Amino acid sequence: MPKRTDIKSILILGAGPIVIGQACEFDYSGAQACKALREEGYRVILVNSNPATIMTDPEMADATYIEPIHWEVVRKIIEKERPDAVLPTMGGQTALNCALELERQGVLEEFGVTMIGATADAIDKAEDRRRFDIAMKKIGLDTARSGIAHTMEEALAVAADVGFPCIIRPSFTMGGTGGGIAYNREEFEEICERGLDLSPTNELLIDESLIGWKEYEMEVVRDKNDNCIIVCSIENFDAMGIHTGDSITVAPAQTLTDKEYQIMRNASMAVLREIGVETGGSNVQFAVNPKNGRLIVIEMNPRVSRSSALASKATGFPIAKVAAKLAVGYTLDELMNDITGGRTPASFEPSIDYVVTKIPRFNFEKFAGANDRLTTQMKSVGEVMAIGRTQQESLQKALRGLEVGATGFDPKVSLDDPEALTKIRRELKDAGADRIWYIADAFRAGLSVDGVFNLTNIDRWFLVQIEELVRLEEKVTEVGITGLNADFLRQLKRKGFADARLAKLAGVREGEIRKLRDQYDLHPVYKRVDTCAAEFATDTAYMYSTYEDECEANPSVDRDKIMVLGGGPNRIGQGIEFDYCCVHASLALREDGYETIMVNCNPETVSTDYDTSDRLYFEPVTLEDVLEIVRIEKPKGVIVQYGGQTPLKLARALEAAGVPVIGTSPDAIDRAEDRERFQHAVDRLKLKQPANATVTAIEQAVEKAKEIGYPLVVRPSYVLGGRAMEIVYDEADLRRYFQTAVSVSNDAPVLLDRFLDDAVEVDVDAICDGEMVLIGGIMEHIEQAGVHSGDSACSLPAYTLSQEIQDVMRQQVQKLAFELQVRGLMNVQFAVKDNEVYLIEVNPRAARTVPFVSKATGVPLAKVAARVMAGKSLTEQGVTQEIIPPYYSVKEVVLPFNKFPGVDPLLGPEMRSTGEVMGVGRTFAEAFAKAQLGSNSTMKKQGRALLSVREGDKERVVDLAAKLLKQGFELDATHGTAIVLGEAGINPRLVNKVHEGRPHIQDRIKNGEYTYIINTTAGRRAIEDSRVIRRSALQYKVHYDTTLNGGFATTMALNADATEKVTSVQEMHAQIKKS
């Protein structure tokens, strides 16, 4: 059946901001869907509130709306654009929930819009736990014993039937949000209370515990003629009880017999038929009891998912693209496989002759007090994938690609420690983020495979692989570098050992191992991912390294090549924004006739799509792996400034090895990052900085602090995302910081800066080509200095700064760009206090604000800068004017505190946001209101507000209180704040702090008395005391601000209607051209 002709235009729903459980894999699927549908001649309308995505680039769709994914806003878009169909399967849970809401509210019917890709009934049948259970029974498949509850009474009744331990999951949430495992009644009640609150339908599913069972996933694609193919089988290395997003996973499944695999394959196809997924991809999850082989279906997702992104990258089969085409009526046999150049149809099941391992990346160090044990609720923030010819090779490559300081199975405990065994046993039984390394330690400490299995329930086959690697490591330590003959070294490299790991074991430097390999002429070869296990030829250059005989890389010799180094796994502080820049570099240079080479190991991203670049190397971004690729490709230039800290920290070593790093030189990057060298540059330019000092010892710090004056910002040098950065208010605080946090920097000094309280922070993105400086955009932060720039909302153009102040900044940026000899992108941060401009820092690289600025101004900064790096000046490109748009754009961040119940949700100098949204409006207020709606804020227009502010905010709080009263709010205040308001003639109701007797603040929040809370604090003691206010506000879904500026912005936004007007990016950019 060829494509449908009754449909002319299609609305694609995006996934919105990146949160834990829903990351950039949906940018990858959405971007593929846009391409696939436009190829077929459809008009594509896209809505997604996240500006840091490739899919929201103006070229990707015919009309792009960076608007909140909220049914009322989408209704406006449908009314304006009149699409014939809506495709909800590309934007994760957000898009499915929005589509169901549009259906429920009658919007689809009102405007005659058809849902394609999945029906509302199929989505509901897969997501509604009771309907799903009935459907599975109908086709003879087993599901876990379970019950459904809508209240605590019902929940306790189910628990009596299912027994403890049991697993609790709220309906219609993603990444296991709000779920957990309860071992007793107390834990059960706590999880249920939270889960009922978080489920949009107030529904919980309570299951018998399957902890310790083996977990598998099948990625299935089905078309409307009932052709079904399995794209990939995935096995979870970690047993049931750990969310699949937090498990190490392997493809293809390794420990199934052929018979078991066929049973599972047939079952997964039966599931799709019964649920009614007629077109597109789904993932079906199974659990197998290793004791008796009982197979049960856990769940299915009737959409493109995190696993399908992994399956696409693991096999080269573009699930999202195929799903989009099936949704408009094609069948699998009509679609051709790109990778084999159309030699095979898409109805051929991919077969693979390699092993793929995915390992999740965690960021618990950002969340003091978080429970860091892995459960059924997802907590990882990113993932890394590696490809090898054996399980061992692929696992070790993934470990070093993870960038957590490990080059392989580095030990976690010292075996001399008398507590070592106790610690190992505890870590194996109750898994945290590092369990894989503790397994290796267990073998070093003498545990047997059975002993480890009994603690972990990880299949013995995987454990034997790790045990063998540990034994090989012991042998390397024993024979040393002289014992590494050509055969032994080759054997080690085939098992995935990194040079750096072997060097550590042999007690030499990494360079020595590389020298030895050169002597033996021992280098990796590159194999291609071709979907067909080399049965057909492929022209697609999608490669991975391995130590075998035949190399399939076949690099071109006559073309100018540029290599872009990606950012590796997502983590807080280095996310999709950097991937966005890498993709733009590749696209721009391809347009200019260069052959582009991408090196990255993150399976969720657009950069690792096989058609983003001419050649893709799916490899860890480490010195060894990059040098080997450079050796065979011989690029004319390598770009390290776009992937965040990952490639940046390789810059000097690459340069030393003779690699042509283009753009800003590694030395210039060092001049900006090294405090002392930077100081010289600033002094020479006579720019103002906050008083500061660099110290290497605690007593020296105490002395310097007295000179500078408190409060201070303290941090180690060279960090991204503000790791181990804190504001200290007195000497006791400073001493505590040195004792607990400073081990972060290996002999690197610690920086002390005077903290500018109440200053306005400003971010400026710019491009320099050596002759001129282009200002990309000046962003004024809404939260004051002291809140990490990555966690602060910001406005472009600035909404309070005077023209003069902005001009001073423009001049300073220009001076700095020339002084540091920047070629390409740079980002400068300023603080403005009492009309004085202070320079905070300069980053001569792509910053996380680049995508936002590009969307707001219509200038693709990352593309322009990539061309500058390749030698094309700004004048030649015709991009010389700073664009100041005739409307406001506001970026707001999304924070993951709901996943970490123990953590204080106070904003500070340590970055913790996972994603961002953008709001656009004619006024600042309208733009801010849209950004709030897009970030799922629960702000109400009226009600009762609670004010509790620190000493320094007391004079300004009167103005805020007056604004809230005018808006119709009733006011409550804590003692100190109430006195100040009373003196100004405003009389709030007085409320007790928690230690002042009941009813206190927490009681009132629990009773739902407040619709808005503003709570600002200073000093460790006050922060500890008021933490309960912030946690309760979060728990009971009350909108709260922890800065006064945030409060003023919120009250401004109350008068704007975020759902009234929708504007496409294309219309915005046309307005700029007019003005």
Swiss-Prot record:
Quick one: which pathway? Answer: Amino-acid biosynthesis; L-arginine biosynthesis; carbamoyl phosphate from bicarbonate: step 1/1; Pyrimidine metabolism; UMP biosynthesis via de novo pathway; (S)-dihydroorotate from bicarbonate: step 1/3
Q: Which cofactor does it need?
A: Mg(2+); Mn(2+)
Subunit info here reads: Composed of two chains; the small (or glutamine) chain promotes the hydrolysis of glutamine to ammonia, which is used by the large (or ammonia) chain to synthesize carbamoyl phosphate. Tetramer of heterodimers (alpha,beta)4.
> What name does UniProt use for this protein?
Carbamoyl phosphate synthase large chain
- What residues does the ATP-grasp domain cover? 133-328, 679-870
What is the catalytic activity of this protein?
hydrogencarbonate + L-glutamine + 2 ATP + H2O = carbamoyl phosphate + L-glutamate + 2 ADP + phosphate + 2 H(+)
| Entry EC no(s) | 6.3.4.16, 6.3.5.5
Binding positions for Mn(2+) 3?
A: 829, 841
The gene designation is carB
Q: Which organism is it from?
A: Salmonella typhi
